[in-house]
Each structure stands twice: as C-alpha cells, then as structure tokens.
C-alpha cells in the first residue's frame, strides 16, 4: 500500500513537470533574469539600435594619434643643447621684422621704443617627419624642448616678451625640418644722437641683433626676403610727436671681440625732427624780443626811463628763453643750432642796451645854447650898453615884469623852441622896456628839444639789416642741409 502511494506521487510530479515545460511564455532558467534599465540604453541610442547607429569619424583622432607618435619619435633622443649640424655645417638663421609701432623717442635718455614681430627661420635635420600634413603648427611650449637661436639685441636696454593672455609666440614645423619661430617683443633701444643741428637735426636710430654665444663659424644670420623687404613698418605704426620717420636702411656687420667674430644684423631708422614746436616756443619769441629791443632807437634820447626799461626787460627775456630752451635737451658739452641763434639774438638785445648807454653818455641832456658856451653868452650880455637910469634888474615880456636870474643861466636853463618863436614875432614894445636891457638870440641859436642822436639814426638802419641778414643765412644753411640729408636717405 505504501509502495503504491509513493509510485503515484512520483508519477504525478513527473506529469506536472512535463506540463510546465510545454506551456507558452515560459523561459529557461538562464533567460529568466529580468532586463536592467542599462541594457535598454545600450541597445537604444537615439531611438536606434546599435546596429543602425551612424559611424563617428575618427580622422581627427587618427591625426592626433599619428602626430603624437611623430613628435614622441622626434623628441626621443633629441638633445636641445646641441645646435643643428654641429660639427658638419654652419647653422643659418634667416630673420625678418615687422614693426607694429615705432616710438616714442626720448631726447634726454637718447633711447627709443619699438614694438615688433620678430621672426626667425632655420633648418634642423633631426626634426624631419613624414605625415599627412606638410606644415605642423605647434604649441609654444615645444620651443623649450628643441634648439632655438640665442638671439639678443646688442643696443637693447630693455626687451619685453608679451605673455598676455598666453605667451605671444608661434612655432611651425615643416616636414623637411624647417622651423619658423615668431614672437612679439617690445624693445627699448639706445639711439646715439648728435645735437649740433638741433632742432633741425636728423638721427639714425639703430636696431642691432645677433647670436650671443655662437661665432660666425657656427651660426650666421641673413635676411629672409633680402635687404629691401625684410624689415617692414606698418603704415599707422608711427607713435612720434616730434619726429618724422623718413625710412630705414638694412645691413649686416661683423664685430670682433676677444671670444671671436660674430654676425650682427642692423637696421637704422632715420628720424627727422619736427621744427614747428620750437618755432612757436623759442624762435618767434626770440625774434620778437630783438625787434622790441630795437624800438628804443625810435624814442628820443632824453627818455631815459623808457629806453632803460626796454633794454633791461629784453635782456632778461632772452635769458629766460635761453634757459627754458635747454630743459628738453640732454646736458651736452657743445652748442646746438638753437644755442647759436639764441646767442646772436642775445647779442643784438644787449647791443641795443649798450647803444642807448653810449648815446646817453655823449649827449648833453640840457637846454644849452647850440654852438656857444654859457660863459660866452654872459660876456655878450655884459658888453651890451645899458641905460643911464637907475639899474633895474627886471625885464618885461608881454606887459609882465620878470626878474633876471643869472643863477639859472649857469645851470643851463633856456627857453624852448616853442617859446622862442612867439617872442621873436612880438612887437618891440612888448619885448623890452626902456628901463631894462634884454639880450635875445635868434631862433637858430636856441637848442632844440627832442633832438635825435646820429648814433640812433644809424642804429635804426644797421641793427634791422644785420638781423635780417643773419636770419637769411641761418635758415638757408639748415634748410639746404636738411634737403641733402633727405636725398641721401632716399638713395640708400
């Protein structure tokens, strides 16, 4: 009985298992796992299954990978301490300059400021490569991992490499191993000035650069586009207020020192000073001061205060102008063209003051009789016959009685020309009284007031003529010299 029940239990269990296995919608144990959300994302990208999704181009990724491997291969074993062609050939560095701004120029410090794009090109056999691109633009950080020329500026006082917002440097590598290295620089360079012709002077401000350590047997420099086109100045690049940029001359020099001979590249920028400012500030005031000093020649010689004021004021004015003209110049030991002009103007002004002193010294400031001395006039008065009546010490003029005062005669007091004329034309009864005797000279014998000195008459002509001749010679000399210098620069 028990065996029969166990048999039915096993048969029933087997039948149930068979029924479960054949029912639809059922899964096996390996497929019974529920699908995760991540599985859906992996299978559905943008509404498409992976087998229908578009292919992503991988050219850029391939180029980056290729050039990364190329650079790694080039820099592997590369020694940036050794120049290209060491022991075999001389390294040639080709250069050119683009000037973005020129100026300002400092006369007192004798220096100028220039902002340039400085380009250098050289060939390095170790950096040849073969890739999908012929020219490979590189980051400026790579410049520290390869050899670069040790170029420096011989006459540079201070040079600044711009670093905002990143270092302003450009590095390009050509597949044949040629490199282009460009940087933006602001250079403060010396400009030796010879101020003998100031302010009509012309200067040649040099810019010199070359290798610091390599002699001409190792590194040489040359101009990339020749001497005519290797240095270019932007049309709006002038930052000059007192100068005109006439042009530039490019050249090459060899300098010798105790360590060897070096190649030096030179560029001379020719500057011409603008004279307008100095004409207004110095030349015109000097000319007007000289003319003002010569006005005193037209004042009468008796106007001592007026002529003294003219002379002293003009001398002090010229002194002030000469001091102010030197403030904008370095303290040079020689005289400039402006110094000579101011000195001559000062001489004219001072001579006008000396001329007045001479006239005032040799001219009588009195009303004395012309051609006769006072004692002679008194003797003539004594010899005149007097009336037998009682001596009267008065004389009558136009019905008025005046006492005769001989003390005033001894002090050179006379009657002016304006008073002498009506006295001569008056009636005899109005001139003299029978009680007195009055001695009267003719109008021709009376000294004239406001008389003009012969020295003043000559000075009115000599001084203006000499000053005009000086200006003619001065300006003609320096204008012709300026034209000759400009012509020479154009030829160069």
Swiss-Prot record:
InterPro entries in the record: GABAA/Glycine_rcpt, GABAAa_rcpt, GABBAa3_rcpt, Gabra-1-6_TM, Neur_chan_lig-bd, Neur_chan_lig-bd_sf, Neur_channel, Neuro-gated_channel_TM_sf
Pfam families attached to this UniProt entry: Neur_chan_LBD, Neur_chan_memb
SS bonds (residue pairs): 191-205
Subcellular location: Postsynaptic cell membrane; Cell membrane
CDD domains according to UniProt: LGIC_ECD_GABAAR_A3, LGIC_TM_GABAAR_alpha
Effect of residue 342 to M: In RNA edited version
Any one Gene Ontology BP term: gamma-aminobutyric acid signaling pathway
Glycosylated residues in this chain: 63, 163, 176, 228
Domain comment, as recorded: GABAARs subunits share a common topological structure: a peptide sequence made up of a long extracellular N-terminal, four transmembrane domains, intracellular or cytoplasmic domain located between the third and the fourth transmembrane domains.
Identification of the protein by name: Gamma-aminobutyric acid receptor subunit alpha-3
């Amino acid at each position: 009985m028990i065996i029969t029940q166990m048999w039915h239990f096993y048969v029933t269990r087997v039948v149930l298992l068979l029924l479960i296995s054949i029912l639809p919608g059922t899964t096996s144990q390996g497929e019974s796992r529920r699908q995760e959300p991540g599985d859906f994302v992996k299978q559905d990208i943008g509404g498409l299954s992976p087998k229908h999704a578009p292919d992503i181009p991988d050219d850029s990724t391939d180029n980056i990978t290729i050039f990364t491997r190329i650079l790694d291969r080039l820099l592997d074993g590369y020694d940036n301490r050794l120049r290209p062609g060491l022991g075999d050939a001389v390294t040639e560095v080709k250069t050119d300059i683009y000037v973005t701004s020129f100026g300002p120029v400092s006369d007192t410090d004798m220096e100028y400021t220039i902002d340039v794009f400085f380009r250098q090109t050289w060939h390095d056999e170790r950096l040849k490569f073969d890739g999908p691109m012929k020219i490979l633009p590189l980051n400026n950080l790579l410049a520290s991992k390869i050899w670069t020329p040790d170029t420096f500026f011989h006459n540079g006082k201070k040079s600044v490499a711009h670093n905002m917002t990143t270092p302003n440097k450009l590095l390009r590598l050509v597949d044949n191993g040629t490199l282009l290295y460009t940087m933006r620089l602001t250079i403060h360079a010396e400009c030796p000035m010879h101020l003998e012709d100031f302010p009509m002077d012309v200067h040649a401000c040099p810019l010199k650069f070359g290798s610091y350590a390599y002699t001409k047997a190792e590194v040489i420099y040359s101009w990339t586009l020749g001497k005519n086109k290797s240095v270019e100045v932007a049309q709006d690049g002038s930052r000059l207020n007192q100068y005109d940029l006439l042009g530039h001359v490019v050249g090459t020099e060899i300098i010798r020192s105790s360590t060897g001979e070096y190649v030096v590249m030179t560029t001379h920028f020719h500057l011409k000073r603008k004279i307008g400012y100095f004409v207004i500030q110095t030349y015109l005031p000097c000319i007007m001061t000289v003319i003002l000093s010569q006005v005193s020649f037209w004042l009468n010689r008796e106007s001592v205060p007026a002529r003294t004021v003219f002379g002293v004021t003009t001398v002090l004015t010229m002194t002030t102008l000469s001091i102010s003209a030197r403030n904008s110049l370095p303290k040079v030991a020689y005289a400039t063209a402006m110094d000579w002009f101011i000195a001559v103007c000062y001489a004219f002004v001072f001579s006008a003051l000396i001329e007045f002193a001479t006239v005032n010294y040799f001219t009588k400031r009195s009303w004395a009789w012309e051609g006769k001395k006072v004692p002679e006039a008194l003797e003539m008065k004594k010899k005149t016959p007097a009336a037998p009546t009682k001596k009267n010490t008065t004389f009558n003029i136009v019905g008025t009685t005046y006492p005769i005062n001989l003390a005033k005669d001894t002090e050179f007091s006379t009657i002016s020309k304006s008073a002498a004329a009506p006295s001569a034309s008056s009636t005899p009864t109005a001139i003299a009284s029978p009680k007195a005797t009055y001695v009267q000279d003719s109008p021709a014998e009376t000294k004239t007031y406001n008389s003009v000195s012969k020295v003043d008459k000559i000075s009115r002509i000599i001084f203006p003529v000499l000053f005009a001749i000086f200006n003619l010679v001065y300006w003609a000399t320096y204008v012709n010299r300026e034209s000759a210098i400009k012509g020479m620069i154009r030829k160069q």
